């Protein structure tokens, strides 16, 4: 390792381009904007009769999910396939890790099979970072969610959703509501919104579900949902992550819905053109009313669509020396 290697962020290569994608912390507005611009270009691929481009032909992407997932795992698979990569999805319950093999040894064996990229989801915060520190130099690592720490591709698909529906971030008020304490999505969203210039970021929830140190994110904290929703442009609802909770944080789900559930009446306190988002899975009647989740202001299904494009952008940028945007343009020109 050279002195420059020691100083350079693990996520970036010598040219300041993506090498791994582990967290949004410390990434520049320019790089985040490039990811969004590239994802915008890939949205067009999803409208084609043949939804494929050859950018990662001959490359192998391994999805290694140690936590259950539907949207994230499936959209990463679709993203890699649309880029023409070969995709391996490791079923952890039937893999050698269930027989006592360590995560490190499992990944070393997959590396020996010439995998080019790992998409990792793990219950432990920092797991993806640990793996990125120990893989071969030519292998990329993408964080598909690690503990409470980060979910960077979810953060970016949320930003793409906001940008496509609101045009930008400079004049927006965004409210993030619910279980902030256990949410890696909330952390990634707050980092991205701040980096992209959103002037008013609000977090709303009971004191027992708000972490210490929120001031470092430049947010305003509300404990009253009605007050916090006043005149916001974007509402991001979060589910109660009861699997990560210890007892005593909430009196009941019913009480939580009474105080912090998003109903049609409560949504009326936001701007008339406000959009409603949710990373899923939705708990109807716990954090959000069905009439809101399925209503005209909901863009929840759009988030899923945009997630494929964002993950295509991240996969291609992390595995490429040039911008994916430039590659996509070149590929399109060759077809003309």
UniProtKB/Swiss-Prot annotation:
Q: Name one Pfam family in it.
A: OTCace_N
Output the GO biological process annotations, alphabetical, semicolon-separated: 'de novo' pyrimidine nucleobase biosynthetic process; 'de novo' UMP biosynthetic process; amino acid metabolic process
Per UniProt, which keywords does this protein have? Pyrimidine biosynthesis, Transferase
GO MF annotations, alphabetized:
amino acid binding; aspartate carbamoyltransferase activity
Q: Where does L-aspartate bind?
A: 99, 184, 239
Q: List, alphabetically, the InterPro entries matched.
A: Asp/Orn_carbamoyltranf_P-bd (IPR006132), Asp/Orn_carbamoylTrfase (IPR006130), Asp/Orn_carbamoylTrfase_sf (IPR036901), Asp_carbamoyltransf (IPR002082), Asp_carbamoyltransf_Asp/Orn-bd (IPR006131)
- Domain of life, per lineage: Bacteria
Under catalytic activity, the entry for this protein gives:
carbamoyl phosphate + L-aspartate = N-carbamoyl-L-aspartate + phosphate + H(+)
Q: In which pathway does it act?
A: Pyrimidine metabolism; UMP biosynthesis via de novo pathway; (S)-dihydroorotate from bicarbonate: step 2/3
EC top class, as a word? transferase
Could you confirm whether the keyword Transferase appears in this record? yes
- Listed EC numbers: 2.1.3.2
The answer on whether this UniProt entry bears the keyword S-adenosyl-L-methionine reads: no
Provide one Gene Ontology cellular component.
Answer: cytosol
Which SUPFAM superfamilies does UniProt cross-reference here? Aspartate/ornithine carbamoyltransferase (SSF53671)
Residues the record lists as binding carbamoyl phosphate: 71-72, 121, 151, 154, 280-281
State the family it belongs to. Answer: Belongs to the aspartate/ornithine carbamoyltransferase superfamily. ATCase family.
HAMAP family linked: Asp_carb_tr
Q: Subunit notes for this chain?
A: Heterododecamer (2C3:3R2) of six catalytic PyrB chains organized as two trimers (C3), and six regulatory PyrI chains organized as three dimers (R2).
Biological function: Catalyzes the condensation of carbamoyl phosphate and aspartate to form carbamoyl aspartate and inorganic phosphate, the committed step in the de novo pyrimidine nucleotide biosynthesis pathway.
User: What is the name listed in the Swiss-Prot or TrEMBL entry for this protein?
Assistant: Aspartate carbamoyltransferase catalytic subunit
Q: Which organism's genome codes for this protein?
A: Azotobacter vinelandii (strain DJ / ATCC BAA-1303)
């Amino acid at each position: 390792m050279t002195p420059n290697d020691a100083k350079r962020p693990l996520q970036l290569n010598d040219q300041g381009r993506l090498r791994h994608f582990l967290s949004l912390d410390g990434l520049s507005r320019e790089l985040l904007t490039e990811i969004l611009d590239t994802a915008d270009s890939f949205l067009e691929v999803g409208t084609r009769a043949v939804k494929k481009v050859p950018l990662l032909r001959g490359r192998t992407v391994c999805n290694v999910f140690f936590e259950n997932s539907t949207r994230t795992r499936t959209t990463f698979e679709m993203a890699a396939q649309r880029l023409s990569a070969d995709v391996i999805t490791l079923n952890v319950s039937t893999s050698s890790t269930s027989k006592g093999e360590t995560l490190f040894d499992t990944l070393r064996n997959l590396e020996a099979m010439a995998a080019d990229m790992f998409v990792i989801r793990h219950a432990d915060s920092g797991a993806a970072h640990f793996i990125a520190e120990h893989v071969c130099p030519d292998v990329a690592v993408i964080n598909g969610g690690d503990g409470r720490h980060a979910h960077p591709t979810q953060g970016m698909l949320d930003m793409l959703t906001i940008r496509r529906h609101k045009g930008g971030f400079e004049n927006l008020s965004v409210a993030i509501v619910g279980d902030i304490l256990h949410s890696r999505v909330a952390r990634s969203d707050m980092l991205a919104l701040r980096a992209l210039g959103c002037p008013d970021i609000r977090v709303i929830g009971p004191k027992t579900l708000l972490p210490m140190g929120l001031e470092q994110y430049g947010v305003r904290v509300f404990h009253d949902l009605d007050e916090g929703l006043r005149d916001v442009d974007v509402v991001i609802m979060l589910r109660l992550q009861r699997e990560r909770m210890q007892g005593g944080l909430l009196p009941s789900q019913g009480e939580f819905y009474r105080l912090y559930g998003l109903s049609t009446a409560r949504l009326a306190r936001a701007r008339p053109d406000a959009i409603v988002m949710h990373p899923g899975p939705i708990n109807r009647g716990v954090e959000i009313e069905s009439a809101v989740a399925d209503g005209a202001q909901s863009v929840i299904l759009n988030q899923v669509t945009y997630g494929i494009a964002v993950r295509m952008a991240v996969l291609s940028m992390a595995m490429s020396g040039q911008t994916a945007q430039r590659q996509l343009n070149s590929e399109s020109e060759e077809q003309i």
